């Protein structure tokens, strides 16, 4: 096995019915970027892909309400979301969208392969329609009481309270989410994915993940196997990917269900990336090599799609379900190595809700605060393994106490004293036991933090990295180089050399978490070139969804290989010129808490 691993970082696709809020990016965004950046620094071949999920009824309904087409609405939020994720520093190799001709072609190929192998069949079911409009009500637009747990607010596809999968006809007292009326149920023909045909294969695969996956994800996924039922993969609507079969392709009101096409986006985005890089077959290194690895990042409400449905689709397309079959034209495809799910982030004790305006959008947040401050909070205090509440008081405290007073303070006092008194990185004289101990601990942290990051234990990894910062601050205070200036200037230079090496190490350890500020520290230490790559927007041109003509849309990409960052202690170079540093982070006034709470209450009450 090559020492360089091929690692697919597959990031859940944000839905393009509005801007994304900080709860969204705490689940799919920041954790996946921390992981991808670390793996790149470790020398691995990373492919990080995602895009906007643009089909389905919610977009169609919102577009109708605004008097625009579904396409226009998707175009608007595709751009807004892409701009916000770039501002947050998420290092996608490709962030695209589900309305490209490439995506349509790959989705239809997956459907065709599954159908040919016998894992898709048609069935007449009961579909909900609005009595007043005659329009179809997809399952997510039918609500009612869950027949399992009694929760009043279960959707027609799933109860968020107990996690059980449902159909609209299962609900007690069903009602339309749009206007509250009781829906009518009529016969309609749909295609179904035969999930029970994968029960044995899914069980064997999931049980092999014991000790590797987060316990909550594995337990939830195994429980899903107890209730495997065929699941509809088509819907009665005109906004989505056409069904690629004779007699169905041209039906105006039958489309593939949005969840079916969205999970295929990981594959279609990888194929699109390969085409854009000039090597159309390159995607296969991440999807078909036996030693390739794939990590899927999402919030816990999407576990079912990634640990049950998508693996079933991959097995069926590859001809590996209970009915056998042959791989489709793309070839056999790898199952996920790990499904990495975060829990939910709440806000000041309340569930995020765009409709009730209990929300802060990424764009609004970044207009007032630094991206790295948000990234730090999400990892340090976020919902990695349990639901967590975002509070402005805690955000301000962590920003001021941990970023400004701890890490920022170490950077400032170490570099400023060396720049002022020496003007460059000094030579190290003879090292004392204290010098060697703190340097050895700093070097050892790369293995400790790296092991945590490899296992997607981001909070623990950040704590270990910040422990290096704390020990460096302690060393600086105890050695008191400002006192040595007159009594022992050579010793002062040695202490400053050690302190600057610790700053350099800490910068490297914190790079996956805090890429923008790590670039600043690299420059403050006299570094040249790019330390760690940052994402950028590019305009892409493609025919959209098989329609006539072409469309221009933004994609996120970046140059992440051509930089200096690598996961090891890199010796600083004596003689490198130093300039007085600028503040690394902004200290926030306590008044921010009251201002933001007032802003939240005003919005929620509007």
Swiss-Prot record:
Catalytic activity field: tRNA(Met) + L-methionine + ATP = L-methionyl-tRNA(Met) + AMP + diphosphate
Molecular function per GO: ATP binding; metal ion binding; methionine-tRNA ligase activity
EC number: 6.1.1.10
Ranges spanned by the short sequence motif 'KMSKS' region, renumbered to the chain: 351-355
Residues engaged in binding Zn(2+): 146, 149, 159, 162
Assigned protein family: Belongs to the class-I aminoacyl-tRNA synthetase family. MetG type 1 subfamily.
HAMAP family recorded: Met_tRNA_synth_type1
Function recorded in the entry: Is required not only for elongation of protein synthesis but also for the initiation of all mRNA translation through initiator tRNA(fMet) aminoacylation.
GO biological process annotation, one example: methionyl-tRNA aminoacylation
Residue positions of motif 'HIGH' region: 14-24
Cofactor annotation comment: Binds 1 zinc ion per subunit.
Subunit relationships: Monomer.
Disulfide bonds: none
Gene: metG
Main location: cytoplasm
Protein's recorded name: Methionine--tRNA ligase
Co-factor(s): Zn(2+)
Organism annotation: Thermobifida fusca (strain YX)
Pfam families xref list: Anticodon_3, tRNA-synt_1g
Gene Ontology, cellular component aspect: cytosol
